Amino acid sequence: MKLIVGTRGSKLALAQTNKVAERLKERYEVEIRIVKTAGDIMKDKPLYEFKGMGAFVRALDTALAEGKVDVAVHSFKDVPSQRVEGTVVAAVIERDSPCDVLISRDGSTLEELDEGAVVGTSSLRRRAQLSRLRGDLRFENLRGNLDTRLRKLREGNYDAIVVAEAGLKRLGLDREVEYQPFPPEVIVPPANQGIIAIATRKGEEDLVAFLNDEKTWLEAMVERAVIKELGVGCAVPVGVYAEAQSRVRLICEILDKKYLRVEEKLSKDTAVEEAAEIGKDLRKEIYGG
């Protein structure tokens, strides 16, 4: 049986898709098909301005729903709660690093950056979190693939940039670039960072069920439960991180109208439901309902 696997065309997206494709090849003949998305076409637009439309997702899932591809591979953090009708995330593979990292032009850490240093990031969450640690920092928008971001840093457009460690590692750049990783307790990552999701049409989930990593799936669902009940996207600075061990450790951080941080240990059996309640409570406290 042959599966056509849909993906974005960036180096990072292809690296993620190849990781999935190698596993699919254990059972299927695999063809990779590139689909352009809004996020690829409008490269100068900050992601928070896309407002929940799924800048890197919708075109892929539409191709899936229309039968142009059989499977779509996503970075799960980009997948909105509202999906293209007829599609479903059917599996996730084991999570890569959820952490954000700082890469500076001269090897400085966050603490060592000069006063008023310029940090490249378009993420409102990263800006808000870094400002709490270093209120003197200045921020400039930064989009593009990792190679582009690193080139702009080297050219002197920024003193430092912040990116996801998972992306560096998937492209093998972690061996070439010196960086400072931020533990999730310090810079709480966005929900589902470091997780690769595999989507299928509804009713065809069994095609990829053998790929699913249960620990990562639980972490993903807990984080998404919080975000869904909060009712926010990347236009609001929110970090949510879950780590499943004997219990599920959950950290939520909101930096909007006021600062709120919650840390809880949840039972595995009821973690998703408990996380949803936490999301509801946080929404009430910040937005009044």
UniProtKB/Swiss-Prot annotation:
GO BP terms in the entry: protoporphyrinogen IX biosynthetic process
UniProt-listed PROSITE patterns: PORPHOBILINOGEN_DEAM (PS00533)
Domain of life where this protein originates: Archaea
Keywords for this protein: Porphyrin biosynthesis, Transferase
SUPFAM superfamilies: Periplasmic binding protein-like II (SSF53850), Porphobilinogen deaminase (hydroxymethylbilane synthase), C-terminal domain (SSF54782)
Additional note from the record: The porphobilinogen subunits are added to the dipyrromethane group.
Protein name per the record: Probable porphobilinogen deaminase
Taxonomic source organism: Archaeoglobus fulgidus (strain ATCC 49558 / DSM 4304 / JCM 9628 / NBRC 100126 / VC-16)
